[in-house]
C-alpha cells in the first residue's frame, strides 16, 4: 500500500504521468469538463470532498511550477481563497496567473485531467501547471 496520502488510483496515475508544463485542473462541483478531457470524479455530496482538502492531497505528490485562477475568485472572496493564499505564501503553488472564468474554462480544454470535488463555494477552481523536481 502507498505511504503517501493520495490513495485514488486514477488521480495517482495521472499525476505520475504528468510532464513539465502539463496541466491538472481541480474544480468545484459545477465546473464543466470539456469533451475529451479525463474526468476524475471525487464528489460524493455537496462539500465532500472540499476543494482545499483535495488540493492539499494532490500537492503531496505533484511538483507545481505555477497555477491559474479565475479572477472572479478575488471578487467573491470564498473562504477557500485564504487557504490558497497560504499555500502560495508557502511556495507550494508557484507563480499565480489570473484569467477570466471564461478563459479558465478554455484553458481546462488543455488539461490532462479535471478533478471534480464536491466543493460548492464560487470559483473554487485551480489549474496546476506541472513542474520538475530537478
Swiss-Prot record:
Q: What is catalyzed by this enzyme? A: beta-D-ribopyranose = beta-D-ribofuranose
Q: Which residues form the active site?
A: 20
Q: What's in the keyword line of the UniProt record? A: Carbohydrate metabolism, Cytoplasm, Isomerase
- Is the keyword Cytoplasm in the record? yes
This entry's Gene Ontology molecular function terms read: D-ribose pyranase activity; intramolecular lyase activity; monosaccharide binding
GO cellular component terms, semicolon-separated: cytosol
Its name, as the record gives it, is D-ribose pyranase
**Source taxonomy:** Bacteria, Pseudomonadati, Pseudomonadota, Gammaproteobacteria, Pseudomonadales
